[in-house]
A protein has these predicted regions:
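Auxiliary alpha/beta "docking" domains used to position bulky ligands
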Residues: 1-196
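Iron-sulfur cluster-binding cysteine motifs and their immediate structural context
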Residues: 19, 202-225, 232, 246-270, ...
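Alpha-helical adaptor scaffolds
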Residues: 290-326, 333
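Amphipathic alpha-helical scaffolding segments comprising HEAT/armadillo-like alpha-solenoid repeats
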Residues: 310-314, 345-359, 378
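Short coil turns that connect the paired helices of HEAT/ARM alpha-solenoid repeats
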Residues: 319-323, 357-366
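Conserved hydrophobic register position within alpha-solenoid helical repeats
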Residues: 332, 370-371
């Protein structure tokens, strides 16, 4: 096989299924993969021990006999304001927080996996020879961004994310590892897309927790996304105030990136902010968010007051489940502590009562965060 026409067929089929971009790369050891060991040795991965899986250094370790990797991009950009443009000044009525744009809608793992499975089925129908295919969406021992770069889909930016000249960085990556011998999207004489970051350092300078050790190198232990999602313990106190009102993930280094200023919008309804995820909001007598968009600028009191049962129900099928109930409540307490509420106001009295209740929680990370927040608003 190994005809470029086959690769063109795969790319066109992927686009017909709904992917915005698709590229193919030959399986191999790429120089960027070797840099991971040094990054891990510096301790930058924090509690993410799964990143030390030795299979991540070579896709041959993941699928024996692998010949090619199909990399697909799916845009999740919505028409809503960026975190750097959104106002959070209405604190004296109802403090609000920020959830990362990618988590507003349906769990992207499910959305991409469905499409990757359809693409794999198309491959089986099209190619007569027997082959193996295995798909991953941000869950396996695969470094998707490196593979995407060498498939010609973009370059690795100073914020460590994959950047595409047209799409910016608001997209998800999914891959299919296969024993099919497909021609690569880039010929042997072609290099991956050039680094177009130039002298820009807006992402580096905008990070409120100074998570970037240097361009292209992040200390995940200081990244707001890591702190709000992956970290299971209490958030280091010196990082709580810089985190501001973030309760799940962070978009700042993407929101300030010039390549995202003209990025096209996603058409998929799955990635729009969830609307009224459960009847519990009605039962509690509260309205979740402006315009009934429950996860865009969510009310912090609502998030902090969620029971574990309500959390499981409301965030079923959402990537927010990864932080777990105690993590989300911890984050909401931290954000309330950064809300600059005026003493004696109705909202300050109400929030103080909520935090006092949470300060007595049997969950240490919740109780500790609530006590810190109380000390900030009283």
């Amino acid at each position: 096989m190994n005809h470029f026409s086959d690769t063109q067929w795969v790319v066109e089929r992927a686009k017909s299924i709904g992917f915005d971009r698709c590229g193919v790369v030959r399986a191999g050891r790429f120089p960027e993969l070797a840099q991971t060991s040094e990054w891990l040795a510096r301790g930058y991965a924090g509690e993410m021990e799964y990143l030390a899986d030795p299979r991540r250094s070579d896709v041959q370790n993941v699928l024996p006999g692998i010949a090619s990797v199909i990399v697909c991009l799916l845009n999740y950009n919505t028409a809503h304001p960026l975190s750097t443009e959104s106002t959070l000044q209405n604190d004296q009525v109802e403090p609000r927080g920020w959830i990362s744009r990618y988590a507003w809608g349906r769990d992207y793992h499910d959305v991409l996996r469905e499409r990757l499975d359809r693409l794999a089925d198309c491959l089986r129908e099209h190619f007569s020879e027997p082959f193996k295919a295995r798909s991953y969406v941000d869950t396996g021992p695969v470094q998707e961004r490196v593979l995407a770069k060498h498939a010609g889909l973009g370059w690795l930016g100073k914020n460590t994310l994959l950047l595409n000249e047209t799409l910016g960085s608001f997209f998800f990556l999914g891959v299919i590892l296969t024993t099919l011998d497909l021609a690569p999207s880039l010929s042997a004489k072609e290099l991956p897309p050039p680094d177009l970051c130039g002298n820009c350092r807006q992402c580096l300078d905008a990070c409120p927790t100074q998570a970037f050790v240097e361009p292209y190198v992040m200390d995940a232990r200081k990244c707001i996304s890591y702190l709000t999602i992956e970290l299971r313990q209490s958030i280091p106190e010196e990082l709580r105030e810089p985190m501001g009102r973030h309760v799940f993930g962070c978009d700042i280094c993407q929101d300030v990136c010039p390549w995202n200023r003209r990025a096209p919008l996603a058409a998929l309804q799955e990635f729009q902010p969830r609307v009224r995820p459960s009847q519990n909001e009605e039962k509690a007598g509260i309205s979740l968010c402006p315009g009934d968009e429950s996860l865009f600028l969510p009310k912090l009191e609502w998030l902090a007051g969620l029971s574990e049962t309500d959390f499981r129900e409301m965030f079923s099928g959402s990537p927010i489940r990864r932080t777990k109930w105690r993590g989300l409540v911890r984050n909401a307490c931290n954000a309330l502590g950064n809300s600059a509420l005026r003493p004696g106001t109705r909202v300050q009295v109400r929030v103080s009562a909520l935090l006092e209740r949470l300060a007595a929680s049997a969950e240490p990370v919740i109780a500790e965060s609530a006590r810190w927040a109380l000390s900030r608003i009283q």
